[in-house]
């Protein structure tokens, strides 16, 4: 039967590498032979070491997730050296680990940047070119990213002899241990610039403000991001720039409310137009007038769908719909002529009484309440 390596470390099956390492270190502090010399602890430490090795290896972990046991397929037992052992113990307590990692490159990739910009619904409908200003790091034009006044190559750090690390002996409950930490002189790169640029201080980059133009595609929606490749910050030592992301925030529109690619609006219909029908219009986001019909007998809260007059499909073809929500306006003040006409209408339709029994149809208010309580 395959061993449950997740259970051995006490982690979930979707645990990240960092979560696996953290669980291993926690158990290693308890079961390492230097702190617990029992046979049971030695066996437990061997198991957690093997479990860490397996779960940190992508191929072995895949076998485990398929129900197999990679250590039963010629993998053997890892013992104390599997997946870290003492090195991980040292790292857990002293931060630098027990072994040398070597110098890191002085030239590093730049960071991505995020900027938020506000758009009107009209701009999102038509697409636009949006000017922005960002505070960012750019390549130093004086040293061209080398960090050196003379643009010469850096020298080997004399403090760490190019290793990027310094080592020192520390006492612990494990005895005397040799720990490594980044060299403070070269900051872990193993190199120093003998004549730092007086503009960037040897960093190879300077901070400045840049003006850019963002191409906003038609149909973009609130919360979406536009990626501008290579427009982020230049990295230390003149490393390649990261990307710039522009996050869109939409202003509230006085007429339309967007849902997906549909545009919703409220249309106020006079009582007479609701009864007889009418033609009305609304100004679209492009500035054109859109005419549409109010059908005779339309009721309050009914919707009228105007096909193809909504938002454009982002990077595609077609448009959403415009949806008008009917609000029938009942007059509150009437002149004598209007009262006379309405009284004549009421007399003409005298067979319609305002006193009604409760409508018991399924579509009525009482019908809906009845059906709900029957559930």
UniProtKB/Swiss-Prot annotation:
SUPFAM superfamilies membership: Chaperone J-domain, DnaJ/Hsp40 cysteine-rich domain, HSP40/DnaJ peptide-binding domain
Statement: the UniProt record of this protein carries the keyword Acetylation: no
The record's free-text note on cofactor binding: Binds 2 Zn(2+) ions per monomer.
Disulfide bonds: none
Keywords of this entry: Chaperone, Cytoplasm, DNA replication, Metal-binding, Repeat, Stress response, Zinc, Zinc-finger
Domain J: 4-68
Zinc finger (CR-type): 127-209
Subcellular location: Cytoplasm
GO molecular function: ATP binding; heat shock protein binding; unfolded protein binding; zinc ion binding
Annotated CXXCXGXG motif repeat ranges: 140-147, 157-164, 183-190, 197-204
Primary subcellular site in the record, as a coarse category: cytoplasm
UniProt binding sites for Zn(2+) 2: 157, 160, 183, 186
Residues reported to bind Zn(2+) 1: 140, 143, 197, 200
GO CC annotation, single: cytoplasm
Family: Belongs to the DnaJ family.
Database matches in PANTHER family: CHAPERONE PROTEIN DNAJ (PTHR43096:SF48), DNAJ HOMOLOG 1, MITOCHONDRIAL-RELATED (PTHR43096)
Entry's free-text remark on domains: The J domain is necessary and sufficient to stimulate DnaK ATPase activity. Zinc center 1 plays an important role in the autonomous, DnaK-independent chaperone activity of DnaJ. Zinc center 2 is essential for interaction with DnaK and for DnaJ activity.
Function: Participates actively in the response to hyperosmotic and heat shock by preventing the aggregation of stress-denatured proteins and by disaggregating proteins, also in an autonomous, DnaK-independent fashion. Unfolded proteins bind initially to DnaJ; upon interaction with the DnaJ-bound protein, DnaK hydrolyzes its bound ATP, resulting in the formation of a stable complex. GrpE releases ADP from DnaK; ATP binding to DnaK triggers the release of the substrate protein, thus completing the reaction cycle.
Record's protein name: Chaperone protein DnaJ 1
Organism phylogeny: Bacteria, Bacillati, Actinomycetota, Actinomycetes, Mycobacteriales
């Amino acid at each position: 039967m395959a061993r449950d390596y997740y259970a051995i470390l006490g982690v979930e099956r979707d645990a990240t590498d960092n979560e696996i390492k953290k669980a291993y270190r926690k158990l290693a502090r308890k079961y390492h032979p230097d702190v617990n010399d029992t046979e049971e602890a030695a066996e437990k430490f061997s198991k957690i070491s093997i479990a860490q090795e397996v779960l940190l290896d992508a191929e072995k972990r895949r076998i485990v997730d398929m129900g197999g046991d990679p250590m039963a397929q010629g993998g053997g037992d890892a013992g104390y050296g599997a997946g870290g052992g003492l090195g991980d113990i040292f790292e857990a307590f002293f931060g630098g680990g027990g072994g040398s990692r070597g110098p890191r490159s002085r030239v590093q990739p730049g960071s991505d940047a995020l900027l938020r910009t506000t758009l009107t619904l009209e701009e999102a409908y038509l697409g636009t070119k949006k000017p922005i200003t960002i505070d960012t790091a750019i390549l130093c034009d004086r040293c061209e990213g080398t960090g050196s006044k003379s643009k010469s190559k850096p020298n080997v750090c004399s403090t760490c002899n190019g290793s990027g690390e310094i080592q020192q002996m520390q006492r612990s409950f494990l005895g005397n241990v040799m720990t490594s930490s980044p060299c403070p002189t070269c900051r872990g790169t193993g190199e120093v610039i003998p004549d730092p640029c007086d503009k960037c201080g040897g960093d190879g980059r300077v901070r400045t403000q840049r003006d850019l133009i963002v191409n906003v595609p038609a149909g973009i929606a609130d919360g979406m991001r536009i990626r501008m490749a290579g427009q982020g910050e230049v990295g230390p030592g003149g490393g390649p720039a990261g990307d710039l992301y522009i996050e869109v925030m939409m202003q509230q529109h006085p007429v339309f409310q967007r849902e997906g690619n549909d545009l919703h609006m409220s249309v106020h219909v006079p009582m007479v137009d609701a009864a007889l029908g009418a033609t009305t219009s609304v100004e679209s986001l492009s500035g054109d007038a859109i005419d549409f019909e109010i059908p005779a007998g339309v009721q309050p809260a009914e919707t009228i769908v105007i096909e193809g007059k909504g938002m454009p499909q982002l990077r595609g073809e077609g448009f959403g719909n415009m949806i008008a929500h009917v609000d029938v306006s009942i007059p509150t003040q009437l002149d004598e002529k209007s009262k006379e006409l309405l009284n004549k209408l009421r007399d003409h339709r005298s067979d319609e009484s305002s006193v009604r029994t409760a409508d018991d149809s399924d579509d009525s208010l009482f019908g809906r309440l009845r059906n709900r309580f029957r559930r």
